[in-house]
Amino acid sequence: MSLAASALSALYARPAPQAPPHASHLRRNVMATLGLALVFGAAARVIELRPLELLHDAGNIGVFLRGYLHPSFAHLSEYAWQCVITVCIALWGTLLGAGIAVPLGLLGARNLAPHPVVYFAARRLMDLLRAVNEFVFALMFVTAVGLGPFAGMLALGIHTGGVLGKLLSETIESIDPGQVEGVAAVGAGRLHVISFGVVPQVMPNFLSYILLRFESDIRSASVIGMVGGGGIGFYLWDTIRAFNDREAATVILLIVLMVMAVDVVSSRIRRLAI
């Protein structure tokens, strides 16, 4: 074969030119943006999103809010005591949830589950506990144990157990396996491996999750009384339903102050303990 023929063959054998990497990356970003825009556009149509009506009805909103500008403090002590009950509901609900989360988190972690069936069952149970809202659990427990804070605490605890269990299992799955293998290498049993190889690695994050969930449970406990779960939520629903704007304003103000105080305290505890 001649030199010219070889050069011609090599020329045609070259691969087709490809688009620069940045061009394909830009194209993917544009397509992803258009896809998200279509999804949000369809969702806006489903929920009948009409933001201009807020401006059109701004006068009615102002009339509604003016009724809340002059809170009444005639029943302040009663409402304050209900806030204390609400904090206690959240406190024990979070504690119950943490207790439920520990076995579920251990069994629902892929690297600790004793069998795939156990792993699957623990995961699905956590999904169930997270999927059912606290209000639904509260309605169930009100039927079972009657009206009051105990039903609210059980509802919060069951739901919180699913949330914390999911977070704990994912934390366990991301731990350093070297420390676990080191404990197992000296002949330690499964309980000792968990105690000395797993717990020290996950405890700081788990405590942080518990404190964050306690803040969330405070907010949930503030309204769970609407369905008979005890606490300040019942008075919030009662005053709003009766169009007693001044009393409702007092209840809302106390709830806001309670949530702010709990957030500040839990943030300080988290910085000191973790």
PLM features per residue range, with description:
Residues 208-211, 249-274:
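C-terminal transmembrane helix and the adjacent membrane-cytosol boundary/short C-terminal tail
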